[in-house]
Structures are given as structure tokens and as C-alpha cells.
């Protein structure tokens, strides 16, 4: 976890985690934080599933999850993978396995790069409405059954050098965990750690862990406790971040960001998904925007722009739109658009280029802190583009 000095550092210090390969994509603290999503097509619809995966890949998604609720769905993954490879798409595939999923997981492991299991459902017993408690003997007996059921999958993944996600959901904890720990972050962590310890006992370490909840405070507490527990027990597995069932629109994006960005700022997280009730490809820009905003992974131009006030000397909203349209393909640059000289030059000091209102009908162009020239406002955007070209930092858009 963060040291006292790191807490006040402007650089994010990631928790050190081991590298887990998911196909050709590495997940771990030595690698860029990977962006993933999940298609919403029926897996038995081969053509539809392939099309959905290709749309995600085109949007920049780096890992795609697919639901496999039956053996038939698991076998369909082989056809989906072959169809993708025939079209030149090698994006890693993850199978989502839930209720009593051993047979399904063993089949689908042949066709995917990672298997995701839900500890609360992998060995599933229907809840007993008359039960009042679990004795230690009963709790341990179920644990033994879980290990017996889970071990064959671990062995297959180990032999095939595939990865596993232990994906806990707050809403689907096993009955014995609820009775013992309650509907709490601790219950989520213990649910995951039971499976982590089994993997460790079988010398299998290609593990990624998620602790998702639909409420950000629960999710935050669960991930923090999970990281602390792993550190205490000597495990350094990567974390997959997400707020599940976040909804749609602005609020869904804000809710996801509240959870994911908070943990990323604390150094936790090695891969992420923003779960929206929208077309899956709409999740991807949100993921990259979160990473960009924190300075963790730069995949677009960073625009710095003031909110505008009575001192603004031009239509800032319109000009920002024009500047963005002209330069949005110049990934890696920081460009500032500021309304006046009162705060503009200082607040944009870290930008590569600046566009600042200088006087009525006049703007000044900056390179870093240095004013380069003044030009009429009507020529401002064109002059900014020319300055970038003069510096050799311009590339033509695709």
C-alpha cells in the first residue's frame, strides 16, 4: 500500500503485482492497465457474437468476456474463436462461468485464454430458508467439496498455461459466507481467498481477482481489504476493477468513475471494465478517459480549458470545439485553450501548446510557457496547427 510520502506525491504508485498473461495481453503492475468489456449477444449466435467482439476490438477493447452458461455455449466458443482468427482478430477471450460450472469450465478452457468463475456460485447449493447457522464442521466440509470440485479446473488451466479470474460479486455470496461474515466486504474477501488458497496449494498462480459491487463504497472497501489481505499473506495477484450494474448515461459513467478512479489513484488495479447498460463498445472510451484523467495511460490529446467567465475574450466553447476537431488525432499532446491572460498562462504551464485570449479579437499562441505570436482570432486555430507543424509534431489524420 502507499507510504506516507507517496500519499502526497503527484505520481500514482501502483501496487506491485505479478504478471498474468491473458492471451498476448499482460496484466500486472509492470504493464499498461488493460481495458476490457463483455459482449451481450447469445453465445450460441456465432455470427452475432463474432460481430460484437469485432466491434469491441475496433473500439480499442483489449480483452473480451463471453457468457458460457451451458456446455453448448462452451463448445460454441471454439467456433467463435476460429471465426475471429479467420478474420485476423486475436483479441484474448474470457469465458464467464457461474452456477455449478466445473464441466462447463473444463470444456471452455480449451477455447479461451481465461476462465472467470464466481466463488459464490461455482459450487452452488440452494439456500435453506430454515437454516440458522453453519457450524465450523459444516463450513469446512463445504470447503473440502469446493476444493475437490475446483481442483480439476485449476489443473487444466495450469497444464494449458491459461489464466483464471476469481470474480466475486457482492450480490451472490455463498450462503455459508453470508452466515459467517455477513453481507460485507469481509465476506467478499473471504470468498475470494478461499479459492486463492486452493490455487496456491496447487501451485497455480495465473490469477486475476475482482471484488465487484453495485455500490461504490462497498466495492472500494472490498478491494482495499482484498489488497491488504493478499499483502499480509504474501500474494501479489493483479486486480480487475469494476462497479457492477452501474446503469447508463452520465450517472452510470460517474458511478463507475467514482469507484474505479478512486482505487487507481491509490495504486490499486491492473485491468478494468466500466459496466454500462448500453452497447458494450460505449464502455471503452470511458475506460480510456479514466486512465487518461489520472495520467496513468495516455491514449488521446489532453485538453486543458477554463470554464469561461466574464473576462473571456472569445466564444471559448466554440473555439475549444474547433481546436479539438483540428488536433484530436495528435495523441500524446497537451493543448490548452484559455479565455484570458489573468490565469491562462499560469494554469496552462504544463501544456505543450496554448491558445489564450490576449485582447478583443486577438489571441496569443504559446509553446509551453513561452508566448510565440499573436494572431487575429479568426486565424487562431489555423495558426495553432501551423505552429505544431513547424515543431515537427504534426501527423496527418487517418
Curated annotation (Swiss-Prot):
What is this enzyme's class at the first EC digit? oxidoreductase
Where would you find the membrane-spanning parts of this chain?
Answer: none
Pathway the protein acts in: Isoprenoid biosynthesis; isopentenyl diphosphate biosynthesis via DXP pathway; isopentenyl diphosphate from 1-deoxy-D-xylulose 5-phosphate: step 5/6
Enzyme Commission code? 1.17.7.1
List the Gene3D superfamilies hit by this protein, alphabetically: Dihydropteroate synthase-like, Sulfite Reductase Hemoprotein, domain 1
Record-level Gene Ontology MF annotations: 4 iron, 4 sulfur cluster binding; 4-hydroxy-3-methylbut-2-en-1-yl diphosphate synthase activity (ferredoxin); iron ion binding
InterPro entries for this protein: Dihydropteroate_synth-like_sf, IspG_bac, IspG_bac-typ, NO2/SO3_Rdtase_4Fe4S_sf
Residue numbers binding [4Fe-4S] cluster: 306, 309, 340, 347
Protein name according to UniProt: 4-hydroxy-3-methylbut-2-en-1-yl diphosphate synthase (ferredoxin)
Name the cofactor(s) required for activity, per the record.
[4Fe-4S] cluster
Regarding protein family, the annotation reads: Belongs to the IspG family.
User: Does the keyword field hold Transmembrane helix?
Assistant: no
